[in-house]
Amino acid sequence: MAKDVKPTRKNLMQIEDRIELSERGHDTLEKKRDGLIMEFMDILDQAQDVREDLDGSYERAQRAINMARAMEGDVAVRGAAAALKEHPELTTQSKNIMGVVVPQIESSKVRKSLDERGYGVMGTSARIDEAAEAYEELLENIILAAEVETAMKKMLEEIETTKRRVNALEFKLLPDLYDNQEYIEQKLEEQEREEIFRMKKIKAKKEEEEDALAAEEEAEEEPEAVTADD
């Protein structure tokens, strides 16, 4: 790449400016990458807790529904589920984490009272109520897990993008610029040495010509001096 650059002082100044800008950009991206990794680790810790809660609530919901089916029968359980009139509502917002937009999911009407579940209190048992509560808890944890894991995915994508940009600067662009800078500096030094050598030759030649001219003038003056003595 360096051979494609003309070795001029103007190009050298432009490359030095690009190096300065690229080095600042590299430092900024490194700080961003490190900050993103720290944020990602915090979200990862949160995700592990959420995943444990989700697994636990799933097991509780399964036990509760199995118990309700065993005690009340599938028909009663399906009837209670079909009686639900108000379904959960979800709204999504967003927040910014170091330039990464991640979702925030707000849920409502997930947890319900006995009346809100739609089935008659007199026609069901506590086992069905326990199963309903367990699945409401499970749904809340599913929503939270979806939010956290989506944030993790977006953060990880941004980390990888930032890493690629850091590596492109560190291992491609900056080395090429340094090579170009070194190439131009070497060529300019060669040109300067050649110019100094050329000027010395001109000076030496001029001195030789001046010495020769002085010798000729001196030779012309000597016969005149001899004639005057005679």
UniProtKB/Swiss-Prot annotation:
GO terms for molecular function: ATP binding; proton-transporting ATP synthase activity, rotational mechanism; proton-transporting ATPase activity, rotational mechanism. It comes from the Archaea. Keywords: ATP synthesis, Cell membrane, Hydrogen ion transport, Ion transport, Membrane, Transport. GO terms for biological process: proton motive force-driven plasma membrane ATP synthesis. It is found in: Cell membrane. Residues 208-230 have a biased composition (Acidic residues). GO terms for cellular component: plasma membrane. It is a peripheral membrane protein. Residues 204-230 are annotated as: Disordered. It holds the Pfam family ATP-synt_D. The keyword Signal does not apply. InterPro entries: V_ATPase_D. Belongs to the V-ATPase D subunit family. Component of the A-type ATP synthase that produces ATP from ADP in the presence of a proton gradient across the membrane. PANTHER family: V-TYPE ATP SYNTHASE SUBUNIT D. This is A-type ATP synthase subunit D. It comes from Haloarcula marismortui (strain ATCC 43049 / DSM 3752 / JCM 8966 / VKM B-1809) (Halobacterium marismortui).
